[in-house]
Amino acid sequence: MKLYVYLLGFIAYALSVYSCKNENDELFETSLANISDIEVYWVRNTHSESQNIYSLAFTGANIGWFNVTTREIKLKNIKLDPNRFPVNSKLEFRIKDCPLFMASSFVTNINSQVFLDLVLFYDIIEDKYYLDDCYPNTKAIKNTADVQQRISERTTHWEVFINTLKAEKKLRQ
């Protein structure tokens, strides 16, 4: 049964990569883009996916640096206020018109929900942002099959994001 679930997930992932590749061949062949091409949108879900509301949260120009080890993302010239984050919204990371990956939520230290997918975590005590694979970011949750599958599905697009930051010298180890 697990094999079928993984196979189905792989097929869905392959189709999403393939559809982006047709639209932006150069982007995925070189795995590089300009930092100015990165855009991150709040996506407020509606009942119809075609009517979702997109509003710009920040761009690549607002990314000061990203630490691959800690997953901290330093934003400059912008402060994301968790109180103003639209309810039931996600964060979609894009390069040009092609979606890279989606953060399932914007969470803070005071959230009590568990998220088994990528989140933008804001540490209100240290005033820092992180792109974590789950929330809370513990080994017990991170090692679950669901979280590991989502990490695997995001790998190709995550590498494009990392390589773009690396080319712009905005990557820290």
For each feature predicted by the language model, list its residue ranges.
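Bacterial Sec-dependent N-terminal signal peptides
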Residues: 15-30
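Extracytoplasmic
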Residues: 27-122, 136-153
